[in-house]
Amino acid sequence: MDKLKMQTVNKADENFKKLAEMFPNAVTETIDENGKVVRAIDKDVLMQEISCKVVEGNEERYQFTWPDKKKSVLLANAPINKTLRPCREESVDFDNTENLYVEGDNLEVLKLLQETYLGKIKLIYIDPPYNTGNDFVYEDDFAQSTDEYLANSGQYDEDGNRLVKNLDSNGRFHTDWLNMIYPRLRIAKDLLSDDGIMFISIDDNEIDNLTRCCSEIYGESNLIATFVVASNSAKNNSKFVSITHEYLLCVAKNKEETPAGWAVAKTNSDSFVKVSQQLVKSGKTMDEIHSELLALVKYPKYYEFDHYTYVDKRGPFRASDLTAPGSKAKYDVIHPVTKKPCKTGTRGWAYSESEMQKLIDNDYILFGSTEDVMPQLKNYLFDNEKSLPKSVLFFDSQSSTKWMKAQKFGFDFPKAIDYIKFVISMYPSTEFEVLDFFSGSATTAHAVMQLNAEDGGHRKFIMVQLPEETDEKSEAYKAGYKNICEIGKERIRRAGSKINNANEKLKDVPLLKDDKDVQLFTSIAKNGIDAVERTKSAFERVDCSCSVDTGFRVLKCDSSNMKDVYYNPAEYEQSLFSRLEDNIKEDRTPEDLLFQVMLDLGILLNSKIQVRSEKVGMRSYSYFDVEDGYLIACFDKNIDEEVITAIAKQKPYYFVMRDSSMANDSVATNFEQIFATYSPDTVRKVL
């Protein structure tokens, strides 16, 4: 029966093992700085094995480096003795939700998630500090004491990670930002699945360095795109140019494995359709409407609709060529007003005469004012709503800013909900995990829930945020939000409540006759604007028949549940060791222990957890049942053979208990025999 590690993996050790497996003859022994014999890699032997050019000393080479880069790599690889403690009182629907909200330093949280979520995340979106000269960034300096942090900055967390303003007068301006972002990106790569993708928002200050970081970590060939994201809200802190754009860097874990089919809805299509329909209702002629739409599509917000400059009762459409190369279909098409044959080109029509007549009868042909204009086919926007995402995007952030201000959350430049929904929808699936480890006001969580409500998806979110204190002068602080995590959690609660209320209202609306037949939705959309609106609401009611997960489990990063003696028993005198009744900290609950066990065993933190109470003989006991017997954890004291036998008969995959919980020496002696009899395949672990 083995003891659990109860600490994160040492990536440097893992890398050593990989090299040793590939090149065992390169493994040797040497003396370290403490005089101990340790295993090492013989560089000369390794170079012989891989037979490649080695760049030595000051020899010129292309490289991306900065002061403390080596320290950043070591920081990413170093293990930590931390845990995530559940907080039921701040959670929503803790027992049933599959969403997570994690409070803590995101570097530490990423390390804690590293084994459990290794290769399991399909999409990561982050909006890190932009390093504008007035940002707060993490300074991962674990050597200084908390008192020293207080003296240096006046801003720190209980683990000794401080937040410092990275002013552009600082000589380490880019270095500090790189030291912050680099180790986090390295660990994030491990969390991505082979077909996973990562999106990162950034501006001009660090786009170059961020691109180089991602090229080094992911490989230059896995950079998919750098989107330019335009906004209608200018940042008034620029001296010469009003900045109205930023960037969205998209990188794949492995581009060869990344799924194709990135068909996304055109941005701002609802707004464009609404304006077009208003023009139809205004009574203007087709030519007048065409002129107004030509002017409208010159605005960045509507540039995707530059061909959809006509509109009728069905909606906006683009005029397409009715001829086809090599076609021999030659016949007269009669103008509906002049009753004369329309102009034809050198090529034949793309449709047979009977097919053309059906298109005319159903008003799918656009005729000119006279027969001198060649007729064209109406291609409607609702038939072409999805396409490959464009590299230039436009999103209105004002609505999100107004909503945030109304909630008194105190964020000056929140990301637009529609923008994050668009980013998430680029991944061609509706059931996957979304991770945001700079979650801020939790826009990503809001977007995931909203998108699920709209398309019936089953996406899940993991939000990670440091509980950074809010400014005492801010509206958020005055409204009672003492740190950013309080804002994020409250936003998810309110957004979830709004989504649930909307669903309930839609469910109360009786289905119309046509709503029950999905195949009729497209056909009734061709019968007028009212039918289009009716179709849209019908889709919404059908979508809302599925339940949206608007809950979340709150987990908080904290020191390990285990006392120091658990990790370094050799450093304690035997007399002291024997007096320690337990190696678990006194203030930790059984559920605290369960979540650290789940992390150690690689069990997803949103797994189904049931607390069961049983009675065997005269003895009552309780235990945690995770995922219907995949893990059974019993942290009761004085566990006897009857309890061990009852648990073994359930045949769990894992069984975990306290090392100190066995009632007597007889239980310890017979423990393995009991499991060998009833459940020999169960993996047994102790704390």
Residue map of PLM features:
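DnaQ-like (DEDDh/DEDDy) 3′-5′ exonuclease domain used for proofreading
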Residues: 1-125, 130-183, 527-538, 545-547, ...
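Conserved Class I SAM-dependent methyltransferase catalytic core
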Residues: 164-224, 482-508, 534, 560
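Conserved S-adenosyl-L-methionine
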Residues: 140-148, 178, 205-210, 416-498
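Signature of N6-adenine DNA methyltransferases within the class I
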Residues: 181, 194-195, 204-271
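Segments forming glycine/polar-rich beta-alpha architectures that bind adenosine-containing cofactors
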Residues: 112, 116-117, 125, 268, ...
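Conserved proline-anchored active-site loop of SAM-dependent methyltransferases
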Residues: 120-137, 214, 434-448, 598
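PRPP-dependent phosphoribosyltransferase catalytic core
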Residues: 2, 450-687
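Flexible, glycine-/basic-rich loop-and-beta segments that form/coincide
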Residues: 235-306, 561-564
